A protein has these predicted regions:
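Bacterial N-terminal signal peptides
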Residues: 1-4
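Glycine/tyrosine- and acidic-biased, solvent-exposed loop/turn segments at the edges of beta-strands
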Residues: 6-265
Length: 265
């Protein structure tokens, strides 16, 4: 597509298939423009983005930094309005997401596909890689493990209760509760609150904060990661990702609806 950006000093700029042109020629220099309602500043070399592009919240604080090499996006950092790092990824490093207090909440290895979700205290909560997965409580005690689709015996005992449901018990402590059909279950924090629920009949799973607010929700294909107040931080639907600030503003990293171009040098 071609998008008219602006006429600055008599020069007409347009972005076509990722290349910036000025009066039909590949443009070079530092430019400032709007992407949607957000201001962006960065450098183009022979029409291609090159170097670090900064995108700003409406209050002027940095929303994200995108690193480009010859038009290729090689790394990205997202920020909260207070300057705290929200997330980062690159071609060689995993995607990492953080809460506003700096604690890591999730990492995704973009090469292997391994996904790790963390407890509030920074201890791994769940790690998934292919058909293998492991779940820990907040004390780093393993509650569940499956390797290549096969459950691993952790020394726990499955006890059936009078109503037909089950409790998974280890060292006189209940690790999980499972319904009579074995399809719906809940793993527990060390203090007894629901930690993770699953429903094998529809692939729905949820991870909960201790107060019951949903941290993570997935149907096996799509998933949502939330802030502590239940508002979305990160959504993945198929191959589409979305990030949100803690006040609900969507953070968009691509250059859409470009307007108000200004050449700075």
């Amino acid at each position: 597509f071609a998008m008219l950006l602006s006429a600055c000093g008599g020069v007409k700029y347009e972005l076509k298939d990722g290349v910036l042109y000025g009066d039909g020629k590949e443009a070079s220099g530092t430019f400032e423009f709007k992407s949607g309602k957000n201001k962006v500043k960065g450098n183009f070399v022979n029409g291609l983005p090159d170097g670090v592009f900064e995108k700003y919240y409406s209050d002027g604080s940095i929303m994200l930094k995108d690193a480009y090499v010859g038009g290729k996006n090689v790394a990205e950092e997202l920020y909260y309005k207070n300057g705290q790092l929200m997330g980062a990824f690159s071609e060689t490093e995993a995607l990492r997401l953080f809460y506003e207090n700096g604690n890591i909440v999730m990492s995704v290895n973009l090469q292997t596909g391994e996904t790790v979700v963390y407890h509030e205290n920074g201890v791994p909560l769940m790690a998934i890689l292919g058909n293998s997965a492991v779940i820990f409580n907040e004390n780093n005690e393993m509650l569940f493990r499956i390797d290549n689709g096969q459950p691993v015996d952790l020394g726990a005992t499955l006890n059936q209760l009078e109503d037909g449901s089950y409790e998974l018990v280890k060292d006189n402590k209940v690790l999980a509760k499972i319904d009579a059909n074995g399809q719906i279950g809940t793993y527990l924090y060390s203090t007894g609150e629901p930690l993770m629920s699953f429903n094998s009949s529809n692939n729905l799973s949820e991870i909960l904060f201790k107060d019951g607010t949903v941290l993570f929700k997935s149907d096996g294909t799509n998933f949502t990661l939330n802030y502590k107040d239940g508002k979305p931080l990160y959504e993945a639907k198929g191959e589409n990702w979305k990030f949100f600030s803690n006040d609900g503003e969507e953070i968009i990293s691509n250059f859409d609806n470009i307007t108000d171009i200004k050449k700075l040098d």
